[in-house]
Amino acid sequence: MSFPNSSPAANTFLVDSLISACRSDSFYSSSASMYMPPPSADMGTYGMQTCGLLPSLAKREVNHQNMGMNVHPYIPQVDSWTDPNRSCRIEQPVTQQVPTCSFTTNIKEESNCCMYSDKRNKLISAEVPSYQRLVPEPCPVENPEVPVPGYFRLSQTYATGKTQEYNNSPEGSSTVMLQLNPRGAAKPQLSAAQLQMEKKMNEPANGQEPTKVSQVESPEAKGGLPEERSCLAEVSVSSPEVQEKESKEEIKSDTPTSNWLTAKSGRKKRCPYTKHQTLELEKEFLFNMYLTRERRLEISKSVNLTDRQVKIWFQNRRMKLKKMSRENRIRELTANLTFX
């Protein structure tokens, strides 16, 4: 890259020529500290004119000392960027200080302020000395604290309520954590409360589980229809095998290994059907999976069940068949696959 002359004014624009996106090859005069690209015949006016800041230069026009900056309404701060004596901006040193800002009186300030007070400002200024050149001092406001919007604000009722509720906490740092992080502050206390609840649930679980199970199952049997109660009576008289199965399940539930977390191994049915009833229903299901209302009424009379019970049995049987067919299909697919 060749420069026409090695004047100090030309050296000042070296950084600008490398950084600026609107500039290509160098063309500047030694008389005025001005830098513009040479206009070519193909592209016409090129360079800073596209930015809308400087007027274009015609060919062989060198005398542009009095050229000014056009200020447009969408860039109102252009005047403050440039020096009054120069028509183009020179890079300023890094140590330029940001002017101190002040809040206007017509802006509404929040009543509750940020938790970072004067102590926090002193700590920040002591810990980060490298930023003192850019931000020399905090903005002067009437209050020394910075106003924060409402969604960042700490609710004072939350803090006082939590500290009163958990007065027995030995650590004094919990209040500081509550101020800095209101969401995560109550986690240790909540975990302790959960542990106490689990202990209370675990202690009576081993001794009182069979009684709870009987109490839960008895209202289900009592709340059924009178026809279902008659069905229960018929089942208890006609099928002693079902009673033996239920007694075995109760014995299994009495073992100390089963607690309130684990469910029972077997499912106690509310109204199990007899062998004769299931046989007749299975025959009808093999003949036809879906029943009409007339056929359902006939079967319910012959098997001594209600219309609703027959309907529910067929629904469950269809779901069972669907599940079995799905499992068989999966088994066949996995059997055909060979894993190397």
From Swiss-Prot:
Bias type Polar residues, positions: 208-217
Domain of life according to the entry: Eukaryota
DNA-binding region location: 266-325
Chain intervals for the UniProt region annotation (Disordered): 202-268
Basic and acidic residues bias spans: 242-253
Modification Phosphoserine occurs at: S238, S239
Keywords: Developmental protein, DNA-binding, Homeobox, Nucleus, Phosphoprotein, Transcription, Transcription regulation
GO molecular function annotations of the record: DNA-binding transcription factor activity, RNA polymerase II-specific; RNA polymerase II cis-regulatory region sequence-specific DNA binding
Intracellular or extracellular location(s): Nucleus
CDD domains recorded: homeodomain
Gene3D superfamilies listed in its UniProt record: Homeodomain-like
Main location class: nucleus
A GO CC annotation given for this chain: nucleus
Similarity remark: Belongs to the Abd-B homeobox family.
Function: Sequence-specific transcription factor which is part of a developmental regulatory system that provides cells with specific positional identities on the anterior-posterior axis.
Name assigned to this protein: Homeobox protein Hox-D10
Annotated gene: HOXD10
